[in-house]
Amino acid sequence: MDRVHIVPMSDQLYEILKDQYAITKGQKYVFASPQKRDCIISRTTLNKMLMYIGLREVTAHDFRATASTLLYEKGYEEAWIEKQLAHAESNKTKASYDHSQHLDARRKMMQDWADIVDSWKD
Protein backbone atom coordinates (compact mmCIF):
# COMPACT_ATOMS: atom_id res chain seq x y z
CA MET A 1 0.00 0.00 0.00
CA ASP A 2 1.57 3.29 -1.11
CA ARG A 3 -0.78 5.61 0.76
CA VAL A 4 -0.79 6.65 4.40
CA HIS A 5 -3.26 4.73 6.55
CA ILE A 6 -4.06 6.23 9.94
CA VAL A 7 -5.50 3.73 12.41
CA PRO A 8 -7.42 5.17 15.37
CA MET A 9 -6.85 3.03 18.45
CA SER A 10 -9.17 1.80 21.15
CA ASP A 11 -8.09 2.02 24.76
CA GLN A 12 -7.61 -1.75 24.77
CA LEU A 13 -5.30 -1.68 21.74
CA TYR A 14 -3.29 1.14 23.27
CA GLU A 15 -2.74 -0.97 26.42
CA ILE A 16 -1.73 -4.02 24.35
CA LEU A 17 0.77 -1.97 22.35
CA LYS A 18 2.15 -0.37 25.53
CA ASP A 19 2.69 -3.81 27.07
CA GLN A 20 4.26 -5.16 23.88
CA TYR A 21 6.54 -2.13 23.64
CA ALA A 22 7.75 -2.77 27.19
CA ILE A 23 8.63 -6.34 26.19
CA THR A 24 10.44 -5.34 22.98
CA LYS A 25 12.01 -2.10 24.20
CA GLY A 26 15.04 -1.19 22.14
CA GLN A 27 13.93 -3.19 19.13
CA LYS A 28 13.06 -1.52 15.85
CA TYR A 29 9.55 -3.03 15.68
CA VAL A 30 6.91 -3.77 18.30
CA PHE A 31 5.98 -6.96 16.44
CA ALA A 32 9.37 -8.05 15.16
CA SER A 33 10.12 -11.32 13.45
CA PRO A 34 11.42 -13.89 15.95
CA GLN A 35 14.08 -14.88 13.41
CA LYS A 36 15.20 -11.36 12.44
CA ARG A 37 14.54 -8.74 15.12
CA ASP A 38 15.18 -5.91 12.63
CA CYS A 39 12.32 -7.14 10.38
CA ILE A 40 8.56 -7.21 10.87
CA ILE A 41 6.60 -10.43 11.27
CA SER A 42 5.67 -12.05 7.97
CA ARG A 43 2.25 -11.91 6.31
CA THR A 44 1.66 -15.54 7.29
CA THR A 45 2.57 -15.27 10.99
CA LEU A 46 -0.96 -14.66 12.29
CA ASN A 47 -2.42 -17.50 10.23
CA LYS A 48 0.32 -19.85 11.44
CA MET A 49 -0.42 -18.90 15.05
CA LEU A 50 -4.14 -19.52 14.53
CA MET A 51 -3.34 -22.99 13.19
CA TYR A 52 -0.94 -23.60 16.09
CA ILE A 53 -3.67 -22.90 18.65
CA GLY A 54 -6.08 -25.22 16.84
CA LEU A 55 -8.12 -22.75 14.79
CA ARG A 56 -7.38 -24.35 11.42
CA GLU A 57 -10.56 -23.05 9.77
CA VAL A 58 -9.94 -19.42 10.80
CA THR A 59 -7.72 -16.87 9.05
CA ALA A 60 -6.59 -13.42 10.10
CA HIS A 61 -8.73 -12.00 7.29
CA ASP A 62 -11.81 -13.55 8.93
CA PHE A 63 -11.38 -11.09 11.81
CA ARG A 64 -11.55 -8.18 9.35
CA ALA A 65 -14.69 -9.62 7.76
CA THR A 66 -16.30 -10.16 11.16
CA ALA A 67 -15.49 -6.62 12.27
CA SER A 68 -16.83 -5.19 9.02
CA THR A 69 -20.07 -7.16 9.26
CA LEU A 70 -20.73 -6.29 12.91
CA LEU A 71 -19.90 -2.61 12.43
CA TYR A 72 -22.31 -2.41 9.48
CA GLU A 73 -24.96 -4.15 11.61
CA LYS A 74 -24.40 -1.59 14.38
CA GLY A 75 -25.16 1.16 11.85
CA TYR A 76 -21.74 2.70 11.37
CA GLU A 77 -21.17 4.69 8.18
CA GLU A 78 -19.83 2.80 5.18
CA ALA A 79 -17.16 5.46 4.63
CA TRP A 80 -15.81 5.00 8.15
CA ILE A 81 -15.70 1.21 7.92
CA GLU A 82 -14.11 1.18 4.47
CA LYS A 83 -11.53 3.79 5.54
CA GLN A 84 -10.71 1.73 8.64
CA LEU A 85 -10.17 -1.35 6.48
CA ALA A 86 -7.93 0.70 4.13
CA HIS A 87 -10.14 -0.07 1.16
CA ALA A 88 -9.47 2.21 -1.80
CA GLU A 89 -12.31 4.39 -3.07
CA SER A 90 -13.55 2.89 -6.36
CA ASN A 91 -14.98 6.21 -7.57
CA LYS A 92 -11.88 7.90 -9.06
CA THR A 93 -13.36 11.41 -8.90
CA LYS A 94 -14.32 11.02 -5.25
CA ALA A 95 -10.90 9.53 -4.50
CA SER A 96 -9.26 12.60 -6.06
CA TYR A 97 -11.23 15.13 -4.03
CA ASP A 98 -12.28 13.47 -0.78
CA HIS A 99 -9.34 13.07 1.57
CA SER A 100 -11.37 12.97 4.77
CA GLN A 101 -10.23 10.56 7.46
CA HIS A 102 -13.25 10.62 9.84
CA LEU A 103 -10.79 10.13 12.72
CA ASP A 104 -13.10 11.05 15.62
CA ALA A 105 -15.91 8.85 14.31
CA ARG A 106 -13.54 5.97 13.56
CA ARG A 107 -11.98 6.25 17.03
CA LYS A 108 -15.44 5.85 18.60
CA MET A 109 -16.22 3.01 16.20
CA MET A 110 -13.01 1.15 17.07
CA GLN A 111 -13.64 1.65 20.79
CA ASP A 112 -17.10 0.16 20.29
CA TRP A 113 -15.56 -2.78 18.38
CA ALA A 114 -12.97 -3.37 21.13
CA ASP A 115 -15.71 -3.32 23.76
CA ILE A 116 -17.66 -5.91 21.74
CA VAL A 117 -14.61 -8.16 21.51
CA ASP A 118 -13.99 -7.72 25.25
CA SER A 119 -17.57 -8.80 25.96
CA TRP A 120 -16.86 -12.14 24.25
CA LYS A 121 -14.33 -12.94 26.99
CA ASP A 122 -16.97 -12.85 29.73
Q: Where does each model-flagged region fall?
A:
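Catalytic-site neighborhood detector that most strongly recognizes the C-terminal catalytic loop/helix
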Residues: M1-D2, Y14, L85-W120
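Short beta-strand segments
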Residues: R3-V7
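Active-site/catalytic core of tyrosine-dependent DNA strand-transfer enzymes
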Residues: P8-E57, A88
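A broad, structural surface signal
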Residues: D11, E15-K18, A65, T69, ...
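Short, well-ordered loop/turn and helix-capping segments at boundaries between secondary-structure elements
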Residues: D19-I23, L55-R56, E73, E77-E78, ...
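C-terminal catalytic core of tyrosine-transesterase DNA break-rejoin enzymes
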Residues: I41, T45, M51-Y52, D62-A88
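Residue-level marker of regulatory loop/turn positions in helix-turn-helix DNA-binding domains and
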Residues: A60-H61, H102
